Regions:
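Glycine-rich beta-strand-to-loop/alpha-helix junction loops that act as flexible
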Residues: 16-19
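Basic amphipathic alpha-helical segments that dock to polyanions
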Residues: 3-14
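Nucleic-acid-binding surface
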Residues: 21-148
């Protein structure tokens, strides 16, 4: 059978270009979708992680990742934003956790990443940030030298 027949019979559900699921899109984990649609190494960071940690209080509508390309993707009712990060920074594992196959930045790595993209970014609750760890990550990853 061809893919279109599987779709017509309800066996496969189209998710994104060349990506299909055996369950309806609404039943999927949005972080898994975000990881899959980019087809390259990526990790969840910046606004998504900072909002979850209570560091920023504004509503976040996109799942924010970094990758080696910049891209915006919508799948179902979810939106994904991929910010481009140089490979030398992207592939540095400091402050990146593997949570069930999805790479997620720690709060401190997300702050360091945000400062890389926007050095003047305002954090609503900065007292919840360990800035010593942030500075260490910035030094180790190389961010401190990137924007000098």
């Amino acid at each position: 059978m061809t893919i279109s027949r599987y779709i017509n019979k309800g066996i496969l559900f189209p998710v994104y270009k060349g990506l299909y699921s055996t369950v309806p899109i609404d039943s999927l984990n949005p972080l898994e979708i975000g990881k899959a649609v980019i087809h390259r190494y990526t990790y969840l960071t910046t606004e998504s992680v900072l909002s979850h940690a209570g560091i920023i209080s504004q509503a976040i509508y996109d799942y924010t990742f970094v990758a080696d390309i910049s891209k915006r993707v919508s799948v179902g009712h979810w939106s994904f934003r991929f910010r481009q990060l140089k490979n030398e920074y992207l592939h540095n594992p400091l402050g990146i956790l593997n949570q069930n196959g999805i790479f997620v930045a720690t709060t401190e790595r997300a702050v360091a990443d945000m400062h890389y993209f926007n050095p003047k970014y305002h954090f609503d609750i900065p007292e919840n940030i360990d800035f010593d760890k942030v500075r260490l990550i910035q030094e180790e990853v190389g961010y401190r030298h990137a924007r000098s």
